[in-house]
Amino acid sequence: VTETAVEATRSWLNALSLADSNVAAGELYRSLFTLNRTELKPGTREKILEVYRNPVNTVTASLQSHLGQQPLPLSQNSRRSAKIVRELNREMAVGYKTVVVGLHGSWRQRLFRKSTALPIERALRYLGELLVHCYHVYMPYPPLVWLEVHELFRYAQQLQLESVPVEITSREGAGTTSIKERYSQICLLGLCNPYRLPQGEAKKVHTFLYQWAGMADIQVPAGAESQSGNFSIDLLRDGPPMKSRQPVSAGMAKRVRVLDASSLVEKTKSFIRRLEQGEPASQLPLGTECLDSACLEMFRRVLRSWDEASLRQHNRSRGKGLVSVCIGIESAHFFADGQRPFLPPEEIVVASEDMGDSGVTDSDEHSYIDFDLPIESDTEKPESAEAVVKDNFHITRWKVVDQSASGMLLRSREAPGMQVRVGDILGIQFDVAADSVWWPAVVRRLQGDAKGIVEVGVELLASHYEPVTVRVANGSAIFRPALLLPPLETTEHRRPQSLVFSRGAFRDPAGLQLSIISGDKVRNVRPLKLVERSGSFEQVYFADLMEADS
C-alpha cells in the first residue's frame, strides 16, 4: 500500500531499511510506481516526492558504486541492479512531470508562476540522472528521454522561468541552481561522447558540470556561422546537442537554440594548463574528485569533444561476416605468438638490429576517430561461439555490424571470458585460419543491453603487430609483453613505429631506455612521445639508439 499523505509517507520512509540497497530500491520503485498512477493534488504530490528524494538518492548512489567498475557484459544480478536504478530515476522524473502537468493553467500557476520552476528543475534533474546512469554502465538510454528534456526546457522558457533560482538540499549540497544550469549540465555531458568515456568518468564529468555548467549560455540563433564552443540544440529532436558550423535556417529558428560553451571551454583549458604545470588536482576548484594524471586526461577528452568538431573521417559501410577477438595486451600477445605462454628470455645479448626507421617528428599527432554510433534496433541475433580457453586467455566471435577504413562496429552475445572496457586493446583476426594475421585495435565506444548483447566501436591501429618482449635497457627489470606496431604512411597520415604495453609497466617511459626483444634480436630504443594512455595501456613512439648512446 502506497501512502498518499505527506507525514505518513515520511514515517514509512524513515522506517524503511536502506541496509540492503537492492531490496530498498525495489520497495521504493513499487511505491513510486503506484504513487505516480494515483490521483493527487499537484501540491501534495510535490511534497511527497520531496520526501522521497533522499532515500532514492542514497539507494541509487550505493548501487551505482558497485556497478561503475565492472566490465561488460554485466552479470545478471548487476543488470537487474542497473535496471532498477534507471527505473527509480525515471519514476521520480515522471512524478515531477505529473506535477508540472497538473499546474499547467491552474490558478496556482497564474498567481504563483515561479512555483512551477521547482518541479521542472527536479524533473530535469532525474532525467539527467537517468542519462548519466546509462552512460555510467554503458546501457542504452530509453527512447524519448532527450525529447522530454528539451520539452521541459522549452516550457520553462515559455514561462520565463529558466533563470529562476531553485533551492537544492541533497547530497549535492545546499544552495540554489536554475533550470538553465541543470539543462546545460545535461546537454554538455551529452556532447562528451559519453559512451566513449572510460569507466566512472561520465559521473566525474557530470559532477564537474554541476559546478561549472552555469558558465554556458543558451541563446536564440543569430543567423551567423557557429563559432568554436557553440552547439546546436534541436528542441524537437530526441537526441543531445550537435556540433554544427552552418547557420540556422529561418525555418528552423523557432525550434533551435544555441548552446554557447566558449567560456567553459576556456575555463577547461585553464585547468589543463595548471595541471600540466604540476598543480595538484585537489587544490583546484574542479567540483569533482580525481587523481592528477586522471584529471588531466579526462579534461583533454572533454576538451576534444567541446572545442573541436568530431567529424567522422571515413565513410562507413554495412559489415558482414564474423571476426575473432581477444581482449587485452597479454591475450593479444599470446595468440599472435602462436599461443605460446609468455616466458622471459633467459639470456639477452645486446645487439643493435635495424627493424625500420622510426621517423618521429614533432608534427606527428595521434588521430582520434569518432565511433559514436547508435545500437540498431533490429531483431537479428548476433553470433557468438564458445570461448577458446588456454592459460586464461579467450577468443570470442563477433559480428561485424559496419566498418570503415579505420574502424568497425562489432556485436556479440556474452560468452565465457568476455570482459571488455573502453580503452582496452584488442587483437582482431579476420580469418579463422591458424596462421592468419592479428590486427591491433582499441575499444573506443562501448554499449551493452539487458540481454547480455555487447557492442563495441573499435579503431584499428595497424594492419598487423608483432608480439615482442620489453624491459628497461641495461637493467634487471621485469620483462613485459608488448605489441610492436609498424609505421603507417598514407596520403592522410604518417605514423612512425610504436610500442603498446600495459599502463604502468614502466615508470615515466619517456625518460627510459628500453630493450625490445624479438626472438634472438635485441633493439635498444628511447621512447619519444606518448601517443595515448588509457586505463589499460600506453602507446609510445620511439627512436632507435645508436650503439654509443646505449
What are these regions (language model features)?
Residues V1-S163:
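Generic N-terminal leader/targeting and pre-domain segments
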Residues L161-V349:
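Extended, domain-scale alpha-helical bundle/helix-rich regions
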Residues R10-L13, A25, Y29, I233, ...:
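Intrinsically disordered, low-complexity regions
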Residues K41, K47, K83, K97, ...:
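Context-gated lysine
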Residues M298-F299, S305-V437, R445-S550:
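Short strand-loop-strand
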